[in-house]
Amino acid sequence: MKALNLDDKYYPVGAMIAAISDAKNKLLFASDFRKQARDFYQQKVADVYEYYERELRKNNALDFDDLLLVAVKLLQSNEAVLDKYSKRFRYVMIDEYQDTNHAQYLLAKLLASHWKNIAVVGDADQSIYAWRGADIQNILDFEKDYPNCTSIKLEQNYRSTKIILDAANAVIENNEGRPKKNLWTDKTEGAKIQHFTAQSEHEEAAFIGDTIAKKHDIHGVPYGGYGHFISYECSVSCT
């Protein structure tokens, strides 16, 4: 950022990294991104991207996103390379397919183009990585991309109770474009779900602490019998 005289207060390093990563996941080199930059901020992102790309080339290096971008571009532009590797990989298997981005989707499609033996596992109702480029449409369109495929629904749940699954079904049935399925279990009903909305982080922490203390004092539940899951955000800062 210093090399381009950009103030990281207005152009945070984390935001620049995310924007460049998103562009690469959409198969855009720096020059491609420059052409579609629509406003002043995007022009600055393009400046950073071009500088970063030059530095990578100076060091004969690729970053993680380049491993996908360059591979896809190579397979798309060189028929001999595509023919070699699509024949080499007779079977392509992918887990968590709902979390694939555009570059990963195309790479899989290219590698499976000869034998067309592709098996994917995924759940259209639990895509949570759109913020880093995941495209839910990849799994929703799988049967259109491979019309001769066989789909197997895994609807029995071995982990959760019936009450949990009933609540989950009630929520996910509102998702648009999803393939219909109904989660079920042969476990018992289970404890009722408790829901609490806090007005602040302090109120949330106090509620959790009070609840655990009451369970311990009234029912003798040991403190070590609890687990606390939180959503945590952190920013990337480079000096």
Language model: regions and residue ranges:
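Proline-centered turn/helix-capping motifs that create local helix->coil transitions or kinks
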Residues: 8, 24-30, 116, 171-181
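P-loop NTPase Walker
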Residues: 3, 83, 137, 166-169, ...
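Helicase P-loop NTPase motor core
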Residues: 147-150, 155-239
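Conserved helicase NTPase motor core
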Residues: 38-141, 153-160
